[in-house]
Amino acid sequence: MIKDSSVQVEGQEKVCLDQWVAHYRAYAAKGRSASYIPALGEINVSQLGICIVKPDGTMIKSGDWEIPFTLQSISKVIGFIAACLSRGISYVLERVDVEPTGDAFNSIIRLEIHKPGKPFNPMINAGAITIASLLPGTSVQEKLESLYVLIEKMIEKRPAINEIVFQSEWETAHRNRALAYYLKENGFLESDVEETLEVYLKQCSIEINTEDIALIGLILAHDGYHPIRKEQVLPKEVARLTKALMLTCGMYNASGKFAAFIGLPAKSGVSGGIMTLVPSKSRKDLSFQDGCGIGIYGPAIDEYGNSLPGIMLLEHIAKEWDLSIF
């Protein structure tokens, strides 16, 4: 039975979240939608929502938390985990490195300058496209199935693809096609270019909400252990490596600034989603500091492709509740 004091604290947390979401929603006007993907350009950019999941399963939600959106680059985390589970970490890292890059997420310049063209990390497009070719299976559907199974294992519901967004991405994926063909030429793609690209763009088009990504964040926060179900659902080594990559490479070429001023492992997507997590801290003045997952949605993005009001909201929360890992 939950004590009255716990209920009171959680009520205060909800009041704070509601106030902060209302405040930072106004900053959405300074951002823009990812209009280079036509379907995303039609989204209402004034939306802002958040879901926080604690280890005991308690959820605190505010704003437009239930609005469905596509994973976009957040799917790179899922793809990396799935590839590591099926191929092993060593095999995956022979084809994709773990180094940060200050370039844009869809840049091709590093592949050309640094021989033999190995992608710098799995959180940029070149790395994620390579990872898509490493997923288990011999067909597009079989490779996607490995992602569906993994996601369902973590959030206990089967995801679906937003076909409108996928078609919009497929028709405008000129840069990604260039990346894929360059990777194929250099021997990093293990499957057909067009099939690999279809897998990648469909994984980006998987539809979820803030609760879903908060649950995934919670599991990663606890090194692959699901504290609600009391079950190890991911190998600890894979979860820890994934968190390290999220911290160093997860917020595009704003990852360094994000680590310095917010200090949490996170992965964003141009749809406006941010999946972040708070590892358990030695000092636990607040329940959040015992390890939690956070999902944010705010489709007004900044020049880096990150949710502008979402980052502002998260920075405020991290400071107010002392969530930084540093």
UniProtKB/Swiss-Prot annotation:
It catalyses: L-glutamine + H2O = L-glutamate + NH4(+). The keyword Lyase does not apply. One of its GO terms (molecular function) is glutaminase activity. Substrate binds at S73, N125, E169, N176, Y200, Y252, V270. It is an enzyme of class 3 (hydrolase). It holds the Pfam family Glutaminase. Keywords: Hydrolase. GO terms for biological process: glutamate biosynthetic process; glutamine catabolic process. Its EC number is 3.5.1.2. Belongs to the glutaminase family. Homotetramer. This is Glutaminase 2. It comes from Bacillus cereus (strain ATCC 14579 / DSM 31 / CCUG 7414 / JCM 2152 / NBRC 15305 / NCIMB 9373 / NCTC 2599 / NRRL B-3711). The lineage of its organism: Bacteria, Bacillati, Bacillota, Bacilli, Bacillales.
